[in-house]
Amino acid sequence: DLPYLMPVDNEKQIYEVLDGELGGELLNRIEGTGVNGLGIWYGGYKLFTTNGPEIHSPADFQGLSMRVLPSSVLTAQYENWGAEAVPASYSELYSVLEEGIAHGQENPVQTIALNCYQDVQSQMVQSYHGVMHYVLLANTAWFESLPENMKEAIIEAEEYGRKEARKAYAAQEADYIATLESAEGVHYYELTPEEIEVFKASVQPVYESQTAGSQWQMDYVKRLQEAFAE
């Protein structure tokens, strides 16, 4: 969830890095917790949405309240930009927006469209500030109890499903965007490259606060940044 850790508008590069050694290292960190990480699945770039002013710079968040998942990273992100972070569960999100408990939120375009958040939000901002990912997990004891041929079949099926899901998302994304663009009273727009650079320049305090105390996290984030910069 670290803002602007992932490359802007470049899914192919994200896939290459997370399907490779660095993604495997992250999955290996899950070992010993009772579950195995089988793969990292793409869920789309997150948008900012608000029911207030347009967002073109970090300063535009001043005075806003933004719903977040219970997450120190997301809380630090919005507080760094001068907004109040309002933790709320996914099931509560629509009512939180409808009742004005929070001015806005962040989610991928398909989550916004399928849950009709465009009915209670007026600004939809493609910011490329973050990417939603999901990790497919298997119970370790169950997985290790399987014969080798079944383990191999599951691993192959996960890889196939992960890649097919990416294709399906890409095929549907334009339709979801069209749903938002055509919604009454909704303004959908993308940040300009110049605006994105201003946001990128603002987030270093978030990185420092969220990786402090963990040499592995600091090193891993640095290696991800280097890989995405290639």
Regions found by a protein language model. Give the residues of each.
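N-terminal secretory/targeting leader peptides
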Residues: 1-13, 22, 30-230
